[in-house]
Amino acid sequence: MASGGGGCSASERLPPPFPGLEPESEGAAGGSEPEAGDSDTEGEDIFTGAAVVSKHQSPKITTSLLPINNGSKENGIHEEQDQEPQDLFADATVELSLDSTQNNQKKVLAKTLISLPPQEATNSSKPQPTYEELEEEEQEDQFDLTVGITDPEKIGDGMNAYVAYKVTTQTSLPLFRSKQFAVKRRFSDFLGLYEKLSEKHSQNGFIVPPPPEKSLIGMTKVKVGKEDSSSAEFLEKRRAALERYLQRIVNHPTMLQDPDVREFLEKEELPRAVGTQTLSGAGLLKMFNKATDAVSKMTIKMNESDIWFEEKLQEVECEEQRLRKLHAVVETLVNHRKELALNTAQFAKSLAMLGSSEDNTALSRALSQLAEVEEKIEQLHQEQANNDFFLLAELLSDYIRLLAIVRAAFDQRMKTWQRWQDAQATLQKKREAEARLLWANKPDKLQQAKDEILEWESRVTQYERDFERISTVVRKEVIRFEKEKSKDFKNHVIKYLETLLYSQQQLAKYWEAFLPEAKAIS
């Protein structure tokens, strides 16, 4: 019985007969007559492993290896007499060996490699998720959380006054202490929340939704002016903008889990946000840093290895320009619609005055009713102007700011790449310095040079990982942003078309009701 392989004779190294074969086939197989002086270090050692495995394998395992032989018939049970038995083990013995005592693992490995194509067996170690799968994962992100901002309230007098908003949250998520709660927040609190989130997440490639822009003129009117229609209109615009901003924050899976967001929604009192004023020291420092980043961005020329990022960045820049042009046109439309409403109101007053001075009763009544129709139409124009603003102009304004944040994510990826390249250049200089020390035979400084090389090798590896991670995050964030943008535009455009349809239907209804009065004029 062959248990090792070092003391086996030539006859023992021959493959054993399969069950069901006649003795003649065994004799035919033994006709090779190898020399007795063969050593175990020669090429025939490959049959040693095969012979031992075959003696200790069950017929089921041996049969599973036979389909490799292209000349076998009936699953390898009936062999042709003139075929050499070595062909049966030509492929199987390549994967089997007795170097390890864990023969069961070798058998499983052999069966796996035989059943899979070579390329598939190599690539089956760690499957990488595709970005289509990442997009499907984003579709599963559904959060049962709704925030609302209501009741803007002016607190204080003069230039020290501020406006507080009621932030109401409804949710069934276990992250929060209750299902419904409300807190009071001022505008600087919203700005402070953005600063905290941006500081933590923007450097990692996340798209942090921006808050609405400051309006120094609008807030000055609210602080020192009386409560008129312009102040109420400004507060309503800001309230709606803050609500959209906060809803985008809680819709983001990463932002929702941030403790600063939960604190903003739940905590009764927040510490005063500092550095949010435009003319403060922190505000001026931010403006200076933005200018510095813009200059450094112009000096960085990135060798893009992934064409996807280059194409997406061009799409984002072109889309931002188009949205700016469209936003300017929509703002003009809003102003014209408001002007039309004012002119319609003046027209209605003039018709009413003319109707009251008319002697013809039928004509006087018709003019008076026409004035009433024009007053109703003036209300329609005013409502439609508001719809133009809140459903179109504000949507475009939000996405102009969001696209700027998307560009910032690409810029952050570029900075990470530049840091990686700078580290590689520094590592190359350290290696050159080590080579000069070796050439100059200065062993006292050589160890320090080696330590610096090890340190920079570690930095290069870490920076490369950072670049790969931020590339993955930016790609995933852009895919999510495009989905949210499509859904957002669809909802707003549908609502806008519904308002236009309602306005036209009401307009036709008013004129149809007035037509009999016009025909009744004698």
UniProtKB/Swiss-Prot annotation:
It is found in: Endosome membrane; Golgi apparatus, trans-Golgi network membrane; Early endosome membrane; Cell projection, Lamellipodium. SMART domains: PX (SM00312). The keyword Phosphoprotein applies. Residues 281-298 are annotated as: Membrane-binding amphipathic helix. A 1,2-diacyl-sn-glycero-3-phospho-(1D-myo-inositol-3-phosphate) binds at residues 186, 188, 214, 238. The keyword Acetylation applies. This is Sorting nexin-1. The lineage of its organism: Eukaryota, Metazoa, Chordata, Craniata, Vertebrata.
